[in-house]
Amino acid sequence: ADPSLDYSQVTRPRALPLLTEFETSKGKEWLWTTFSADQIDLNFSNPKVLLTMLEVLLNYVKHGARFIRLDAIGFLWKKIGTTCMHLPETHQVVQLMRAVLNLAAPQVQLITETNVPHLDNISYFGNGKNEAQFVYNFSLPPLTAHAILRQDASYLSQWAAGITPPSS
């Protein structure tokens, strides 16, 4: 990554540096670290990285995975001059993963995880057949726990009534 570029439009989930300098076999390099310096982002625009991650995906399947969660997927693709959130290329990578799984292991389900507004979250269903089979919803677990513990589902019901189904 080039620290001289303008990254002001990039959505930041944390108030930590977006780029971190690391010592590599090629000398010092700046790497993209969306969440923190201990979590380096992968460059999915590099075909070698993309193919390696597809191999990792299939290795999970080989070892019995039935559900695969794509954590913070909205941040996957980097494009200077954008928010770097929910870019078309990100959806294309999810579609590619789904296509690979449909061929190699159709029983395996993809779950996308994005802590974002509902409509952005459900965009990872794609057309209903080409992206994730499930999207993780951050509001649902605490509201469900609250309803069970309080024996009162009013907050859960109120929240659910405001959700637009993906088919709408």
Task: Name each region found by the language model.
Residues 1-63, 76-78, 82:
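Substrate-binding/active-site clefts of carbohydrate-active enzymes
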Residues 1-9, 103-168:
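Conserved alpha/beta catalytic core and glycan-binding cleft of carbohydrate-active enzymes
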Residues 20-38, 89-95, 123-139:
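Short, charge-rich amphipathic segments
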Residues 41-121, 125-129, 142, 146-147:
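Active-site neighborhood of glycoside hydrolase catalytic domains
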